[in-house]
Amino acid sequence: MKSDNHEILVEKDRFILQRKMEVSKIRMIFLNEFRSYFMKEGFLEVETPLRILSPAPESNIETFKSEDHFLIASPELQMKLLIMAGYEKIFQITHCFRKEKCSDLHQTEFTMCEWYRKDAKIEDLMKDCENIIKKEISEISTFFDGNKIYEINKDLCNSLYKKLNFPFEKIEIEEIYKDFAGWNPIEINDPIRFDIDMVTKIEPYLKNKAAVFLVGYPYYQASLARLRDNKKTAQRFELYINGIEIANGFDELIDGYEQENRFIKELAIRKEKGMNEYAIDKRFIENLKIGMPQTSGIALGIDRLLMVLLCLKSIKDVILFPQGSF
């Protein structure tokens, strides 16, 4: 009886993996186009560790322990150290790990593309996003034309591509919250309410928008971004397509003392929440205090963007071995 059950399981696994073969071919092309774009832009591809001693402390992201280290939720700190060391334009495609419930939009292990431009502004990153998406749509469409694909609705994809107007619309956080949440998060410091309304009011509205950049996040949502001159809003943006967050970009904070203070506050919140505790990365902070050039950086979810551009319902559909399925 156990043997029969095992055989049934094997057949089911094979069937699922066979159905993902065409999507895997598209994913290969998709990743190649990312690399091709950055190479043409003069970027250097880098690799940084998956296990580190001191991640950037963020109170809304939990990490996985790995002996006396932690699996990275982002390669951000290590990539910024490279910028401080004189690297000018760098990118990385890597696996990241976050301890969160798996869903159609979340996996505990996922693929991220992160890139940094010295002497650049967030507007340069927005142009990168638009140019990359244009290239990806072109390559996906070419693949559609030359191949029979049964797991993807080509008509739905083509409809989405026609709706994507370049350059993408930009919407200030202050305005969209006033219109759809009924309050001004720039004047009222309420991060919990901000997060709840983002999920329940703002993102549902954004499903009506093909693509949009949300800009001008409140200072308490600055994370590792610098503030605008008004000190109330951050030089930060997020890219949404069909109401799904795809990328998060910053004009990077280059004041080491301010960054250290932010880390201390985040660590205190993490402790209150009972989250993993770790020391501040002193090497990062001390180097930042010595100096870092004006830099903009961004993290983009590879799995999410591919899922959205293929009009699939879950990132599980673009990952061969998603958590919770194998």
Task: List each model region and its residues.
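Class II aminoacyl-tRNA synthetase catalytic cores and aaRS-like
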Residues: 1-326
